[in-house]
Structures are given as C-alpha cells and as structure tokens.
Regions:
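An active-site-proximal structural segment forming one wall of the substrate-binding cleft
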Residues: 28-35, 88-89, 144-182
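Active-site-adjacent "subsite" loops/lids of carbohydrate-active enzymes
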Residues: 1-20, 98-169, 216-228, 282-288
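Glycine-rich, aromatic-flanked loop segments that form ligand/cofactor-binding clefts
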Residues: 37-46, 78-139, 175-178, 255-260
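Substrate-binding cleft/loops of secretory-pathway carbohydrate-active enzymes
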Residues: 105-108, 184, 243, 252-305
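Aromatic-lined carbohydrate-binding/catalytic grooves of carbohydrate-active enzymes
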Residues: 35-77
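Active-site neighborhood of glycoside hydrolase catalytic domains
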Residues: 168-173, 177, 182-183, 187-261, ...
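Catalytic domains of carbohydrate-active enzymes, especially glycoside hydrolases
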Residues: 21-49, 169-173, 305
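Aromatic- and acidic-residue-enriched segments that line the glycan-binding/catalytic groove
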Residues: 50-63, 104-139, 179-218, 272-288
C-alpha cells in the first residue's frame, strides 16, 4: 500500500535548504517508518522554484519557525535541490514526486517576493479582485499570497512551460497544488470578462460585475444575480481546460509520469475557487443549487492519474 510523505518547502527549509546530509537522513527515516513515496514541494507561494529552469528565479530564502521564532532562512547552496531528493530517493528505493503551487506569483513576505513584485511587465497576470471599492489588483489588497489570473493565456503558457522543465527530472509524479482561483472575488479582470462574454455567446454584460456578483461579496448571496451560476460554470471550465493542457505538457515530455492534484475535500463550497474535482459523471446540479446542468462537464477527475 502506498504511503506518501509531503515535504513542504518552507517548513523544512532550515533542515534541507543547504544540507544534502539532512535530506539523506530524513529520507532514510521515512523509508524506515514505512513510507513508499516522497512528495517534494519545489514551488512555494512566492512562485519562485527549487528546480532548474530559465523561466523564473530560484528560491533564495524562506521564512520558517525555528523554535518560537519566525526566522528568515537563506539558501546559500548552489546544488540542485530537487535533484538531491531524486538522487537520494532512488538510492533508498523510494518513489519521488514533485509538487508546485500553481497559480501563485508572489507573497507579501519580506516586503514582497516573487515574479509579480519583480517584473512590472507581468502586472496583467495578477488576479483582479471584485472588492467593495471596485475591481482591484490583488497586489493592492491585503491578500498575502498573490495569485495569478488562471484565465490569462500567458499565465497558462508560462505554467505549462514550467511543468515541461519539471517533467525533465526522473520523477514518478507531479502534483499541482493551488490549481485554482484565489477565492470567489477572483477573477474579474477584463480578460476574464471578455472570455466569459464569449462563452455566453457574445453577449455584453451591461451591469458588470453586479450581474455576476456584487462588489465586495465574498460568499453567495441569498438571491443569485443574473449570470452568477453561469459564471461559476465558466470558472470551472477555465480550470478544467488548464488541467488538460498541463497534463498534456507533462506527458509530452515523459508519458510515464503520473499527474495529480492537491485539493480541498470540501466539495460543497469548492465552487468558490473555481474547481470541480469530481468525475464528469457526477451531476453536481442534482445536489447543489449553485451548479448548472453543465457544471458536471468540467469535473476533472479523469485528467488525473
């Protein structure tokens, strides 16, 4: 029976960032404890990475709890973090998987870290939030993790290219975490509006965003605005379509790599992040009034191994 251990990047950075010896020690302990599979987080919420790619910067530091202190841990080592885990896992006879935080591009930590803080040309990639004050870039909100707009074509291409680089490693599997919208208030960019209006057959929404969701609303209202349920359906399609592309990107490099996701189990409210992780045979609309009859078509379970 497979037993997985998930190695979060930040929490384990003090031990592993600069020490192959500690990686070897803990993988031996994991094997001894009966684990069969190691999952290494190689793209934390800053959106920088711990594997070789030319597409984005390497993680230079993380914050982690050391005793009772939240401490900045710098990575001074230049060896390949993921490759060290792969080498040791193979030595120990363990299966090895990599996990990425997907639609993230920055974190408020240290005054702002990550692609969305460094590269102003990517400002349009940042998700646009439906706030009380109006539609606002996530960069100008208190949200600590700065999400991308999952519907933006350039974002999807960037992430698929990143996954191709990741699939070049000797991995058994790749997991996508945070493969979702930030929350119900995202994404209300002009890009998402344009795509939604096309999806609806070329209509023009006169009262935007109110005909979908009132500004500042962070949960479903008692009475649904005109286009709300179709909007939830559209968002599920955006994520479904991306997962198909991401799978194709990974399998195109290495057909044998397993492709999977990390999701929240609270299906009944997971519409708020635009994800239908059920099988397409499960008719969500039979059980929940927020789901249209087409919502089930975007259940992505079949994309996963």
């Amino acid at each position: 029976k497979p037993r997985y251990i998930w190695i979060d990047a930040a929490a384990n950075f003090p031990d592993f960032a600069n020490s192959k010896e500690n990686i070897a020690r803990d993988l031996a302990l994991a094997k001894d404890a009966g684990f069969t599979d190691i999952v290494v987080d190689v793209r934390p919420t800053t959106g920088d990475v711990l594997f070789k790619t030319n597409l984005v910067d390497q993680v230079k530091f993380m914050y982690a709890w050391i005793g009772s202190n939240y401490t900045k841990v710098e990575r001074t080592a230049t060896w390949d973090y993921l490759q060290a885990f792969v080498d040791e896992a193979r030595k120990q006879g363990l299966r090895i998987h990599a996990a990425i935080n997907t639609f993230v591009g920055g974190n408020q930590i240290d005054g702002g870290t990550g692609l969305l803080y460094r590269d102003q040309s990517k400002a349009e990639w940042a998700t646009q939030m439906n706030m009380q004050v109006g539609i606002t870039s996530v960069m100008n909100t208190s949200e600590s993790t700065k999400f991308f707009n999952p519907a933006h074509p350039e974002v999807q291409t960037f992430l698929c290219d990143l996954l191709k680089d990741l699939a070049g490693y000797d991995l058994d599997g790749i997991f996508l975490d945070r493969g979702r919208f930030l929350n119900l208030q995202a994404d209300f960019s002009e890009e998402s509006r344009k795509q939604f209006e096309e999806y609806m057959g070329g209509i023009r929404i006169q009262n935007y965003p109110n005909d979908i969701l009132a500004p500042g609303a962070s949960s479903l209202p008692a009475t649904y605005p005109k286009y709300l349920t179709k909007w939830l359906e559209f968002r599920a399609k955006v994520i479904y379509d991306f997962m198909q592309k991401a799978r194709t990107a990974v399998k195109g490099v290495k057909p044998g790599i397993k492709f999977g996701v990390y999701v929240g189990g609270w299906y009944s409210t997971y519409y708020d992040v635009g994800v239908n992780w059920a099988a397409s045979t499960y008719d969500t609309s039979r059980y929940y009034n927020w789901a249209t009859s087409k919502y089930k078509n975007y259940g992505y379970a079949a994309c996963m191994d």
